[in-house]
Design a protein with these regions (language model features):
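N-terminal acidic, glycine/proline-rich low-complexity segments
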Residues: 1-197
Length: 197
């Protein structure tokens, strides 16, 4: 049986690979992509997600989520991912559009309506998931696990201690980490070693 996942991201080159891999893995049922600000503004990360979904020929919804973190101001990472958040490739003109639901509504509806538990994979700040949990805590009963790219068991990449995705919205991370959901963390100690051939 395919594993049902929702991919919550802020594309970004790293998240582009996540979309490519999740969207083409025969063992995964990618229900949809929810987008937050992070690597760039929400307008740019959302457009990047749409471009990737169209380019890869995926038939899944892309839902815009939180424009800002729960408390602090948005901080982007244009020094790494460029002005567009996905510099280095020119996509053809967009012919698809966003799903009308917000990321939070999509997360809630998908999880509550599923007969099987859903895995939520976050590769950016966890704002959308945290807000969905606060909006409807019942979703916690039907989440298999949260798999996140974030945090670190050693040093940070934004400050000596802080990793970017957690740094962007620490309050969202706090909500997710303190929920009843099983958490699998893929931190900097892992992501710094990944080789893509």
């Amino acid at each position: 049986m395919k594993r049902k996942i929702i991919l919550d991201c802020d594309p970004g080159h790293d998240d582009a690979f996540a979309i490519l891999l999740a969207g083409n893995n025969p063992e995964i049922d990618l229900l949809g992509i929810t987008v937050a600000s992070g690597n760039q503004t929400l307008e740019k990360t959302g457009k990047n997600a749409l471009n990737l979904v169209q380019y890869l020929g995926l038939d899944i919804p892309v839902c815009l989520g939180a424009k800002n973190p729960i408390i602090k101001e948005v901080e982007i990472c244009d020094a790494i991912h460029g002005e567009t958040g996905l510099d280095g490739f020119d996509f053809p003109p967009l012919k698809i559009d966003y799903d009308k639901r917000s990321a939070m509504d999509f997360i809630i509806e998908s999880i509550l309506s599923s007969k099987e538990k859903i895995t939520v994979v976050t590769t950016g700040p966890m704002t959308n998931l945290a807000l969905a949990i606060r909006m409807n805590p019942d979703i916690l009963n039907n989440i298999e696990e949260l798999v996140l790219m974030g945090s670190s068991c050693q040093n940070g990449n934004v400050t000596p201690a802080a990793e970017f995705n957690i740094f962007c919205d620490p309050e969202a991370a706090h909500i997710c980490f303190n929920s009843s959901v099983k958490v699998t963390m893929v931190g900097l100690d892992v992501t710094r070693k990944v080789k893509v051939y």
